[in-house]
Regions:
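Conserved core segment of the aminotransferase class I/II
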Residues: 228-299, 306-315, 389-391
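PLP-dependent enzyme catalytic core of the Aspartate aminotransferase-like
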Residues: 146, 164, 336, 345-354, ...
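A short helix->loop->beta-strand "cap" motif at the edges of active sites that frequently abuts
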Residues: 122, 143, 201-205, 230-231
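Helix C-cap/helix->beta junction micro-motif
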Residues: 141, 201-202, 315, 350
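Conserved glycine-rich beta-strand-loop-beta hairpin in the small C-terminal domain of fold type I
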Residues: 283, 299-309, 319-331, 364
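Active-site phosphate-binding strand-loop segment of PLP-dependent enzymes
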Residues: 146, 150-221
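N-terminal small-domain helix-loop-helix segment of the aminotransferase-like
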Residues: 2-105, 112, 285-288, 390-391
Length: 391
């Protein structure tokens, strides 16, 4: 009997290796060569969680009864803390028993929601530019991607007139992300209201990914503030950015009880819950003071952004000073034929790693993104290196 070669699943051909996975290997090699690359590319908060969060984790970890499997639907303490958080900051009422599903980071929620709502061949609306995982996971699961445009001259908001001209008959899901990554376009009440109206008129489930609402943003908003939104919309939230807990992998989705039950049915077949210590510590973090939030999410990032803005100016890039979030998004000068002409020069000559906007879609091809997830002195050092070169 002839030996058959082992081949990967066909779905692997639908996606490529994540840009940062590939590029970080190159950066690691440059560092191994002694180049000392400063990374301003990844949105991984470098500050610690609040002290009481870590204390609670340690306290629970010492309890010998805390190490067993946990319910997939999350502990009551965590769900209640999530509901209280939404009421406190967004004035949104959620039933902690039926309208909240804790997640192992909101990224896994993209998988769960797609599995729960989308059949192979169904269409999914994905923003351009947008978070690449919306596209890659949809492709892996057999959905057809339909991009909708976000443009600078429209404040990086959906163009509803353009959307209404599209054939929406096969669309099941629409991904939105406000405040927006990578562009920093902020949430707007009128956008949220139009999204709810759009979802109801076309029987589309709108999923708003909302991890950035506290970063450099004085007025956090939720899509679920719109009356009737829970009937047709899902919102993700995450502790990674707003609570400095990216490695803890704690997120949530909020919506109506029926949608939650479908998502839980998928999730219960995929994982076995999150360590109890992480859940109870996360519940503690949701009670962080307003002073903690202001220092961590407004004041610290504001100080860092001043240096990032100077980097943009030295490179000849233009940017919207009203953008929010933990990145700075800027348009490159016309003299560059391609964004990588700029980012590769910055990497190899200034030894600073910044993100080219094309990885987020064709509408990002002439933009760069600078992460604010580095100490002020590091961003200033990056600025000094870039200033030392002629641009």
């Amino acid at each position: 009997m002839a030996n058959r070669p082992i081949e990967p699943a066909e779905r692997l051909s639908l996606v490529s290796e994540y840009y940062f996975s590939r590029k970080l290997k190159e950066v690691a090699q440059l560092n191994a060569e002694g180049k000392d690359i400063i990374s301003l590319a990844i949105g991984s908060p470098d500050m610690p969680p609040s002290p009481q969060t870590v204390e609670k984790l340690c306290e629970v970890a010492h309890n010998p009864n805390a190490h067993g499997y946990q319910p997939t639907m999350g502990t009551p303490e965590l769900r209640e803390a999530m509901a209280a958080f939404y009421k406190r900051w967004y004035d949104v009422d959620l039933d902690p028993k039926t309208e909240i599903q804790p997640l192992i980071g909101s990224k896994e929620g993209i998988l769960h929601v797609t599995l729960a709502f989308v059949n192979p061949g169904d269409e999914v609306l994905v923003p351009n530019p947008g978070y690449p995982t919306y596209t890659s996971l949809s492709k892996i699961l057999g959905a057809k991607i339909v991009n909708y445009n976000l443009r600078e001259d429209n404040g990086w908001q959906p163009d509803f007139d353009e959307l209404e001209q599209m054939d929406l008959s096969k669309v099941k899901l629409m991904w939105t992300n406000y405040p927006n990554m990578p562009t920093g376009g902020n949430a707007r009440r009128e956008t949220y209201e139009r999204l709810v109206q759009f979802a109801k008129e076309h029987s589309i489930v709108v999923v708003n990914d909302n991890p950035y609402s506290f970063i450099l943003n004085e007025h956090p908003m939720s899509l679920l503030q719109v009356p009737g939104a829970k009937d047709c919309c899902i919102e993700f939230n995450s502790m990674s950015k707003s609570h400095n807990m990216p490695g803890w992998r704690v997120g949530m989705c909020a919506t109506n009880a029926q949608f939650i039950s479908w998502i839980l049915k998928i999730k219960s077949n995929i994982d076995s819950g999150t360590f109890r210590g992480i859940q109870l510590a996360a519940a503690e973090a949701y009670r962080n003071s307003e002073q903690w939030h202001r220092e961590a999410n407004i004041e610290t990032y504001s100080r860092r952004r001043k240096y990032a803005e100077q980097i943009m100016e030295v490179l000849g890039c233009t940017y919207d000073p009203n953008q929010v979030g933990m990145f700075l998004w800027g348009k490159i000068p016309e003299k560059y034929a391609d964004v990588e002409d700029l980012t590769e020069r910055v990497l190899h000559e200034a030894r600073v790693f910044i993100t080219p906007g094309f990885i987020f879609g064709s509408n990002g091809q002439r933009y760069i993104r600078i992460s604010l997830c580095a100490k002020e002195e590091k961003i200033q050092q990056a600025l000094d290196r870039i200033k030392a070169l002629a641009w």
